[in-house]
Amino acid sequence: MKISVVTPFYEGDRYMQDYVSCMEKNREMLAQAGHELEVILVNDSPWKTLKAPANGGQYFRVLTNSENRGIHYSRVSGLTEATGEYVMFLDQDDLLAEDGLLRLMQAALKNPSDIIIGNANLGQADGSNLVWYRTADHVKLIWDLQTYLNVGIQIISPGQCLIKKDAIPQFWKEHFVRVNGADDYYLWLLMMAAGKTHSFCGGSPVYNHRFTGDNISADTTATDDSVYDFLELLSECDYFKQEDIFRLHEMITYKAQFRKSNLFGKLTCTIANLDIFIANLKFKKVTKTGYGFNR
């Protein structure tokens, strides 16, 4: 079996050395088990030349956008060229465990599904790491549509996921999010709405989300803007329910209001969205995570 790792690069030279080292270690582990790795780098800063690393061997390929097109477009560009049965979208500044891809592949072969999700280390500003899924109850909610509509996205990054290439919805490949930050949220919603199946790769984290200070995913304003962008697109999707679009809009708007309001404002908007507030309190309790309310 072959895995294609697709990574958009935007002025990411400083990450290249660690990235290549990570891919080489994973390639070696896969090769020992009889699997292949293909790495596709998509240069989204075409004013700078991005070359395949000299020590990257023949499994590295570089595509260059004609202009800056954003993360979603770049991921789809790489996906179009991918030749693996499975694909991973890994960010330029994140890394995998040395056996991360192998363990995900083994999980895929043991329990075939459309997406295999592994645990993640979430880097903190103080240099520590937080393991993302810490309870069995949280694992049960990884692929639960209602949780995504009432609480928020439960996958830190597509870099912790192995996706069957032919399971990625055509709608996602044709309707692009223009604002960077939440095209993965958009992908998971479309896959769940289409009835795509998932499985969980247990054990230690396969993925390390590094805190760089530049992470878009840590900026709730940017990700909210991206969600509002894809909500407009979802209205054109014939299998995504309008009531679910409305619910997601309610949740994102409520949380944005809550974060920027004083105490009185928080109380006022919470009373107006009491069901969402209660859903988030329940989520925080069963998952034992402080990230429940603020996504």
Positions of PLM-derived features:
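Cell-envelope/extracellular polymer assembly enzymes that use nucleotide-activated donors
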Residues: 2-4, 38, 186
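Short aromatic/hydrophobic "clamp" motif used to bind/position activated sugar donors
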Residues: 87
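A conserved acidic beta->alpha catalytic loop
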Residues: 22, 40-51
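Glycine-rich, basic loop-to-helix element that forms the pyrophosphate-binding segment
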Residues: 65-82
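Short, well-formed alpha-helical segments that are part of the catalytic scaffolds
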Residues: 12-29
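Flexible acidic/His/Gly-enriched loops in nucleotide-sugar-dependent glycosyltransferase catalytic domains
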Residues: 27, 57-59, 101-171, 221, ...
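Catalytic core of nucleotide-sugar-dependent glycosyltransferases
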Residues: 196, 209-212, 218-244, 270
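Conserved nucleotide-sugar donor-binding catalytic segment
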Residues: 141-220
